[in-house]
Amino acid sequence: ECALAVGGGFEVRSRQAEGQEELEEPEAHCSGQAAAAEAVAWRAVEAGSAQRRCATAADAGALYSASAAAGLAYGPAFRTVEAAWAGDGEAAARLRRRAALQGTQVHPADLDGALQASSLLARGGGEGGGATRLPFAVNAARLRGRAAGALLAEVEGRGAEAAELRLAAGAWGERGAQLEGFRSRVLASDAAVPPQKQHLYVTA
């Protein structure tokens, strides 16, 4: 459920379905502030440009195998990365064509594909391969038009932890989504929760 507050604040949370187990307090998953976006320049994604800058081809199957080893198992519907390339602090991915947006401007699975591509960025420090990284925060998210058809994701590093993500559709990449100041955090081994008897979701 999404709870709205006066002033534009929101919180996305879930609760156990009645009849499964004893009802508990809602569990918050994210919170934020919604506001009208200021006029900013939209950075279009040029088809082929990111691949030319990212010279190292990455295997999509290996990407999902590494994700599973790190504790992030993606079902077939969320394995949207078809091809990927990595470069110096930059990555690009071609996502599977989606026939229907199901009432959205940008399908959540497609946006998640752009987040998956961010794992290709070379990270400094001692939190490298094998660590489970989870999305933590986004400074700003912007949508522009309906992103249907073939999609290209670009990820550009912004320091050790932050990145800018662009998900675009169309020949000139003028439709899609931008995430500014995206940050992920390493999940500490002692913070992982035990397996649940009743999941709040089903892996698609």
Model-identified regions with their sequence ranges:
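Acyl-thioester-processing domains in fatty-acid/polyketide/NRPS systems
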Residues: 1-204
